[in-house]
UniProtKB/Swiss-Prot annotation:
Family note: Belongs to the universal ribosomal protein uS14 family.
Subunit and interaction comment: Part of the 30S ribosomal subunit. Contacts proteins S3 and S10.
Cofactor(s) listed: Zn(2+)
Binding site for Zn(2+): C63, C66, C79, C82
Native species: Legionella pneumophila subsp. pneumophila (strain Philadelphia 1 / ATCC 33152 / DSM 7513)
Summary of the function given for this chain in its UniProt record: Binds 16S rRNA, required for the assembly of 30S particles and may also be responsible for determining the conformation of the 16S rRNA at the A site.
One GO term describing the cellular component: cytoplasm
Keyword line: Metal-binding, Ribonucleoprotein, Ribosomal protein, RNA-binding, rRNA-binding, Zinc
Superkingdom: Bacteria
Record note on cofactor: Binds 1 zinc ion per subunit.
GO molecular function per UniProt: metal ion binding; rRNA binding; structural constituent of ribosome
Protein name, entry field: Small ribosomal subunit protein uS14
GO biological process, one term: translation
Matches recorded under InterPro entries: Ribosomal_uS14, Ribosomal_uS14_bac/plastid, Ribosomal_uS14_CS
Amino acid sequence: MAKKSMLMRESKRAKLVEKYRQRRNELKQLIKSSDDFQVIMESQAKLAKLPVNSNPVRYVTRCKQCGRPHAVYRKFNLCRICLRQQLMVGNIPGGRKSSW
């Protein structure tokens, strides 16, 4: 289980990403579409002043059950370990154990 502080940090990042998503996209579009050097520089400065944690790259999807940051399936919001446990118990329908 991940520490509560890590889970809270990720939830805070998720809120910041959603809050600044539109503003960040507008500035990026302005930078890409503009031909004026001055406008580009001003837009880049505004983009740099946005909170660092509002960048979507910094947001990590975590397992809803244990908080593990790696190997999380988006469809279930569970890591591979918890997903297997839930499949074996029968909480997720349609799963079957592989054999080859």
